[in-house]
Swiss-Prot record:
NCBIfam families: PRK15408.1
One GO cellular component, as annotated: ATP-binding cassette (ABC) transporter complex
Matching InterPro entries: Bact_Solute-Bind_Prot2 (IPR050555), LsrB (IPR030159), Peripla_BP_I (IPR028082), SBP_2_dom (IPR025997)
Protein name per UniProt: Autoinducer 2-binding protein LsrB
Gene3D superfamilies (UniProt xref): 3.40.50.2300
Biological role stated in the UniProt entry: Part of the ABC transporter complex LsrABCD involved in autoinducer 2 (AI-2) import. Binds AI-2 and delivers it to the LsrC and LsrD permeases.
Organism lineage: Bacteria, Pseudomonadati, Pseudomonadota, Gammaproteobacteria, Enterobacterales
Similarity annotation: Belongs to the bacterial solute-binding protein 2 family.
Name of one Pfam family that matches: Peripla_BP_4
Record's subunit section: The complex is composed of two ATP-binding proteins (LsrA), two transmembrane proteins (LsrC and LsrD) and a solute-binding protein (LsrB).
GO molecular function terms attached to this record: carbohydrate binding
Native source organism of the sequence: Photorhabdus laumondii subsp. laumondii (strain DSM 15139 / CIP 105565 / TT01)
Gene name of the record: lsrB
Principal location: periplasm
Signal peptide limits: 1-25
Keyword vocabulary terms for this entry: Periplasm, Signal
């Protein structure tokens, strides 16, 4: 009898250990940037990892060394095969990741996007820094604050012709220019492909090709500092350089007066919000339009319909969480931020 009891206790212990291991595996979240080695994505990853520690969730930050569909797909497949229960990805393409993401969802993995979305049917929730209307309008307004002429020449310069988020913002920005600044001529739209060296070469090429350029609008973490550096290299103080990047990268250009205004959002908080939302999905199964989540030190966020991003697709368990605020950085406030 004593031997039988001991065997039963041993079996219960083994089952308890197995259950504990399973629970731990179910709380692993992968947080994937477009590529590693860029301050913007590193800051988002730091926020994600910090949120994971606060929640008791194991968060892994990893991405490709170059922004490619193949690189992200390989990581997604690896995380799925390793038993991760949620993946949050900044997509380099709206459709290129979809087959891999749909396979992951079929295996029970929660799929979210952050920073740059996929087609909405390929994920559950998109953690969105701002709607295209908000961010496209922000870009034009920053340029208009400096370009006072009715007739002006403007260039757009960002990462690539296929990346989801930036192309949505640029479309809205160009529409706003056509409606509100009909005398502005968009002389070129060029790309740096997330490469610092190529971005600097491209920015210098733009400035050399248009000696009378009034503004460069660069909504990309590599393109904006490259445009600022190009303006300094070529001594083009009369060009308004605006766009999106991190304050730590842009601080020297703001302090020297090369850049008067640029914008962003708190990407550290974007990483934190992403993990809180992913964790909530792991606990509840779904989040639907109208559901709210109170995140410590950030506040209340709400799931809103996909249509705020211009999509037609709506479904149960599918929507967008928009960050509560965006920031315009100037010499007066930039030292209040460290990311």
């Amino acid at each position: 009898m004593k031997t039988l009891i001991l065997k039963k206790l041993a079996l219960i212990s083994l089952l308890s250990l197995a259950c504990a291991s399973w629970v731990h595996a179910a709380e692993r979240i992968a947080f994937i940037p477009k590529l590693v080695g860029v301050g913007f994505f590193t800051s988002g990853g730091q926020g994600a990892v910090a949120a994971g520690k606060a929640l008791g969730v194991n968060v892994t930050y990893d991405g490709p060394t170059e922004p490619s569909v193949a690189g992200q797909v390989q990581l997604i497949n690896n995380f799925v095969n390793q038993g991760y229960n949620a993946i949050v990805v900044s997509a380099v393409s709206p459709d290129g990741l979809c087959p891999a993401l749909k396979r992951a969802m079929q295996r029970g993995v929660k799929i979210l996007t952050w920073d740059s979305d996929t087609s909405p049917e390929c994920r559950s929730i998109y953690i969105n820094q701002g709607t295209p209307n908000q961010l496209g309008g922000m870009l034009v307004d920053m340029a208009a604050n400096q370009v006072q002429k009715k007739q002006a020449k403007v260039a757009f310069f960002y990462s690539s012709p296929t990346v989801t988020d930036q192309n949505q913002w640029v479309k809205e920005a160009k529409d706003k220019i056509a409606a509100e600044h009909p005398g502005w001529e968009i002389v070129t739209t060029q790309f740096g492909y997330n490469d610092a060296t190529k971005s600097l070469q491209t920015a210098e090429g733009i400035l050399k090709a248009w000696s009378d350029l009034d503004a460069i609008i660069a909504p990309d973490a590599n393109a904006l500092p490259a445009a600022a550096q190009a303006a300094e290299n070529l001594k083009r103080q009369n060009v308004a350089i605006v766009g999106f990047s991190t304050p730590n990268v842009m601080r020297p250009y703001v302090e020297r007066g090369t850049v008067k205004q640029f914008g962003l959002w708190d990407v550290v908080n974007q990483g934190k919000i992403s993990i809180h939302v992913a964790n909530e999905l792991l606990k509840k199964g779904d989040l639907n339009v109208g559901d709210k989540l109170d995140i410590p030190d950030i506040g209340m966020v709400e799931v809103v319909p996909n249509r705020v991003q211009g999509y037609r697709y709506e479904a149960k368990g599918n929507g967008i969480v928009v960050l509560p605020e965006r920031v315009i950085f100037t010499k007066d406030n930039i030292n209040q931020y460290d990311f």
